[in-house]
Amino acid sequence: DAHSHIGGIADLTPLGEDLNEITNPLTPELDAYYGINPKDKCFGYAIEQGITTSCLIPGSANVVCGWGMAYKSAGEHRLIKDPVALKAAMGINPKGCYAAKKMAPMTRMAIANLMKKYLRDVKDYMAKKAAAGDDATKLPPYDLGLEHGIPVIEKKIPLKVHSYMHDMMTLLEIAKEFDILVTMDHAQGASDFADELADPHVKGVVFGPTCEPLFPGEGGKLDYECCKMLDDRGVNVAVMTDG
């Protein structure tokens, strides 16, 4: 399962929420590893449905959310790899969370700006580290959030982005500008951009979940057919549970 939150969202109350840190729109320093309860009964449900491995990621309240990992549904040694991606989000999730607080990002403009600013900051941080060389006195102050972005800039992991049809071209533009790999997660409306998404900066499209209700605007098109359209164009495609 290429997009899941099982083990980190035990119920629908704040006390059961351990993968969605709705306090700052930029939380790249976080790691889903520390929010997972390996004894969560949802792992048993996953096994029953044939899901042996999940990409467990922080929730999508923030523009940059934190690292995600690959994790087995059962067994003694369950962590496969951490990180596998840096989770990010565009559209209604960060807009909805922070508009209620009367703070940025309330618009898609602000989301794009914050995402680009973070990536610029990571590149600047990397340049300062490189310029310092072996001189520890010239190194910039250690910043875990910026450190978590270095594998993205180096194309070792993708930026894994919650994105619907109103955000896909913006995300592709950002991926090209910073020469990074991205996955487009949820991706409702991708059939409108099938040709454009067949781009080397798009590591993959993770569609779904297929059972969610339609909602106005960006979530108003549940186009299952995009999976075949993208596959025909050589795009890596998966279907998520969003568990």
For each predicted feature, which ranges?
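Metal-associated gating/positioning segment near the N- to mid-region
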Residues: D1-P58, V63
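Divalent metal-coordination and catalytic microenvironments
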Residues: H3, A46, L171, L230, ...
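Glycine-enriched alpha-helix->loop->beta-strand junction motifs that scaffold or abut catalytic
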Residues: A175-V182, A198-V206, R233-N236
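Short, basic, glycine/proline-bearing loop/turn elements
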Residues: N20-A32, A175-I180, F207-L214
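Short acidic/histidine-rich active-site segments
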Residues: P58, V206-C211, L230-G243
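Polyanionic/metal-chelating signatures
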Residues: K39-T183, Q188
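Active-site-proximal loop/turn and secondary-structure-junction residues that shape catalytic pockets
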Residues: I6, S60, S163-M165, Q188-A190, ...
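Histidine/acidic-residue-rich catalytic or RNA/ligand-binding cores of hydrolases
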Residues: A10-P14, G66-M69, A194-H201, P216-E225, ...
